[in-house]
Amino acid sequence: MIQVLGTSSGSGKTTIAMALSRIFFRSGYRVAPFKAVNMSLNSVIVEGEYEIARAQWLQAKAANTEPTRFMNPILLKPEGMGASQVIMLGKSLGKKTIPEYYEFIMNDGKRVIREAIDRISDDYDLIIAEGAGSPAEINLLDRDMANIYVSSIYNTPAILVGDIDRGGVFASIYGTLSLMPRPDLVRWIMINKMRGDASLLEPGLKKLENLTGKRVIGVVPYSENRLPGEDSFDYDHPRARGSKITIVRYPFMENYSDLDPLVYTSTGYNYVTAENASDLSDADLIVLPGSKNVFADLEYMRKNGIDKIIIENAGRAKILGICGGYQMLGQRITMGEISADGLGLLRAKTNYERTKTTRSVRYRVDNTLMSGTWEEGYEIHYGAVISLGGERMNETDKGPEGNVDANRLVFGTNIHGILANRSVFRFMTGRDIGEPEEYLRSEIDRFADVVKSSIDVADLIEYASSRE
């Protein structure tokens, strides 16, 4: 196992781990990605029913292996107010407060992480384990199971990645090594996101090596990529001037990965919030994405007049609701004794249930305006959407799914990844889309080539070979 640690969140651990997975796969290794604890609102269904972070799914793609629940044994999905939904081995344990989570991680969490590593080790030659945040959060060291706890299980070496683009990279690396437990497990240092001439760093790199006793394995240049993001900040971008596609960005928006087809086709889109709600009146396509708290996000839209603007434009613009967005477009949402009116644009209602639905689904778009071949998607939701009539949007292996309004301009579905469907993308945006799998392969290869040409891969392979 080789672990990829970072001096901070956003240092590039996820993409570096992805690139290394591809590099080692090309070198003939059976590689598995791993992240003990991931906090992310971007998740995907694997093995038909288990929920893991989309980042580990992508890393498994890079390793050319099937993703499993053991590659991300613990997933945290923030729900606000100091609580997160905890998912263990792909299944939800429900919402836990911070103290409840710490009790869980120190007991069941530690055991599950270790068992997951052992399970993967039986099937693969090499594990590329990604850390989380920084290993030097000194207020949390006894409860940090995502970083040094993982590498200390087998005393495996780590790469410490520093982000030079945000400045202060030498201090952040030296400070991390000074504060983290078991700095002896860090064997290599990597500088990431270098803009300009890397040779300018050489005096500093030599001094850093002398101060730390660690080898700088390489300097990776800054490289734009259009790969699926891990967190919401990966989808922050300058407003696309002139774009007629708007995404309603309510406070509890989740599954940003549904926007990936817009990203990798360079299709411009803009977010709409309370500050620029009037932009909806000029949109050709309005997307209501998933929501971690449908009731709160409905209230947000009502408080800021977003709901009225959407309703006013329902006969003019195309409107697509995905998962929580679909629920909000319906007539009513009920959770026990709590209920709220939806926007009333689709003939559907939602009843929330205790059991979470997590499943892969085969579907084909099948309605008056769109039709297509059978595709793979997935569902992640608590609410059961009940059709009250109207046309279905899709046919699935589980029966009819989704809803289309009478004017055939408002669409709702629980299927994540729906915009990757060629028929849907063409109808909604007026543009053609390529094969997503081919695009992913190409972009993974491109970034892996950048990393491979920038670091001493031979040193890493020599270590991996010595452990066989």
From Swiss-Prot:
The keyword Transit peptide does not apply. PROSITE patterns: GATASE_COBBQ (PS51274). InterPro entries: Class_I_gatase-like, CobQ/CobB/MinD/ParA_Nub-bd_dom, CobQ_GATase1, CobQ_synth, GATase_3, P-loop_NTPase. Keywords: Cobalamin biosynthesis, Glutamine amidotransferase. GO terms for biological process: cobalamin biosynthetic process. NCBIfam families: cobQ, PRK00784.1. Belongs to the CobB/CobQ family. CobQ subfamily. HAMAP family: CobQ. This is Probable cobyric acid synthase. It comes from Thermoplasma acidophilum (strain ATCC 25905 / DSM 1728 / JCM 9062 / NBRC 15155 / AMRC-C165). The lineage of its organism: Archaea, Methanobacteriati, Thermoplasmatota, Thermoplasmata, Thermoplasmatales.
